[in-house]
């Protein structure tokens, strides 16, 4: 699973990445093995993913959140949903 956090490294984007990593851990998954959490900072790459407002979260190519910091619980829910596909 690939979880991308799109943003320019601002505090909101950092909080989003932290929540994504925490969600992976709480689900008993290993960061870097079961799920790769990557930060996308390049404006062109962010735009290519259809993101207009950061932070945004994309899981396996599907944008699940944009323009706000999702809670760890929300990210866990999205991960579980994506695992079923």
Language-model region placement:
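Catalytic cores of alpha/beta
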Residues: 47
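Alpha-helix termini
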Residues: 27-31
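Non-catalytic, surface beta->alpha helical segment in thiol-disulfide oxidoreductase systems
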Residues: 60-85
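Thiol-based oxidoreductase modules, predominantly thioredoxin-like and allied folds used
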Residues: 32-43
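Signature of N-terminal electron-transfer/Fe-S-associated modules in redox systems
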Residues: 24-26, 54-55, 70, 81-82
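Local sequence-structure signature of Cys/Sec-based thiol-disulfide redox active-site neighborhoods
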Residues: 1-22, 26
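Structural micro-motif
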Residues: 50-58
């Amino acid at each position: 699973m690939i979880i991308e956090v799109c943003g320019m490294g601002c505090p909101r984007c950092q909080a989003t990445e932290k929540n994504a990593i925490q969600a992976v851990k709480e689900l008993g998954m290993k960061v870097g093995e079961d799920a790769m959490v990557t930060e996308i900072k390049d404006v062109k790459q962010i735009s290519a993913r259809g993101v207009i407002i950061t932070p945004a979260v994309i899981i396996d190519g599907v944008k699940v959140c944009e323009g706000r910091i999702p809670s760890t619980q929300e990210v866990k829910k999205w991960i579980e949903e994506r695992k079923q596909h």
